[in-house]
Every structure is written in structure tokens, then in C-alpha cells.
């Protein structure tokens, strides 16, 4: 009986002293229609985009967030170098036009400096938005590659 009680007490003590998993304190960073990033004023201005992202991450760090959910595929286009999808016009101003930096790599590097994890968010079904002009879609956009869809 005494041995069982001591064993139970030991197990309970170890369980209570174990480090708890940190809470997931995150925010979404939406890129479609330039809701959060990049600002409309920074489209095509990559140094301004970097400065804006650093300011956002600094603010998230002050808010004690430990993760962001970063939208990297808003309208069948990409905010990272991709062989499958064109560059996003929300980033460059013209769909298919390459940025001079890798925004996803930049976000990951800067977020990790602040102890913030990055989770990517893709929209697998959204091809365009009503306000988008079909003629402005890049030749390698899904709309042109798979019209049967």
C-alpha cells in the first residue's frame, strides 16, 4: 500500500512538473487583395515590402504571438518562386513578373529571429476574384493551363 502510494505520488509529481506545451498564439497574414501584406503602396517596391513585414513581425512579437499563418497562394499564384504557379500580382503588380527576393524565405528568416513560427496558407480552389481581369492573368496561370477545369 505504501509503495503504491509513493509510486502514485511520484507519477503525479512528474506529470505536474512536465513542461506544458506552449499555446498557439497566432494571426493570419492575408495577401489576397493586399489585405495585410504587402500594402498597396508597396506593390513592386521590395525594400518597402521587407520593411513593412519587419514592422508587422515586430508588432506580433510585442503581442507575444508565437506563430503566423502566412498566405502564399492567394489566387492560383505564388508569393514564392514556383515552377507550377506564376508570381502573384498582389506582390509584383503584374502576375508572372518575378520578384527580386523570395518573400517566403524572408518571412521565415525574420519570423524565426523573433521566435515566431510560420505556417503557410494556400487557397487551393480560388482561381480569380471578380475584380480581376482575365486578360491580365499570366500565360502559365491555371485558368489558361487547364481551361477544362
Describe each region flagged by the PLM.
Residues 4-14:
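Sec-dependent N-terminal signal peptides
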Residues 71-79, 106-143:
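Substrate-binding cleft and catalytic face of glycoside hydrolase catalytic domains
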Residues 9, 32, 73:
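Flexible loop residues that form catalytic
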Residues 19-66, 70:
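Mature N-terminal, pre-catalytic/accessory segment of carbohydrate-active enzymes
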Residues 63-99:
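Aromatic-lined carbohydrate-binding/catalytic grooves of carbohydrate-active enzymes
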Residues 30, 34-51, 125-149:
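Active-site-adjacent "subsite" loops/lids of carbohydrate-active enzymes
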Residues 43-63, 90-114:
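Aromatic- and glycine-enriched glycan-recognition loops and surfaces
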Amino acid at each position: 500500500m505504501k509503495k503504491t502510494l509513493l509510486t502514485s505520488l511520484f507519477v503525479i509529481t512528474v506529470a505536474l512538473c512536465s513542461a506544458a506545451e506552449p499555446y498557439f498564439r497566432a494571426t493570419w497574414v492575408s495577401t489576397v487583395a493586399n489585405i495585410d501584406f504587402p500594402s498597396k503602396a508597396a506593390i513592386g517596391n521590395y525594400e518597402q515590402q521587407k520593411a513593412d513585414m519587419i514592422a508587422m513581425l515586430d508588432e506580433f512579437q510585442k503581442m507575444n504571438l508565437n506563430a503566423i499563418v502566412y498566405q502564399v497562394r492567394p489566387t492560383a499564384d505564388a508569393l514564392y518562386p514556383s515552377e507550377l504557379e506564376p508570381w502573384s500580382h498582389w506582390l509584383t503588380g503584374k502576375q508572372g513578373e518575378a520578384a527580386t527576393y523570395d518573400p517566403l524565405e524572408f518571412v521565415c528568416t525574420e519570423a524565426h529571429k523573433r521566435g515566431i513560427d510560420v505556417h503557410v496558407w494556400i487557397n487551393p480552389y480560388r482561381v480569380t476574384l471578380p475584380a480581376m481581369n482575365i486578360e491580365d492573368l499570366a500565360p502559365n496561370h491555371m485558368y489558361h493551363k487547364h481551361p477544362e477545369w
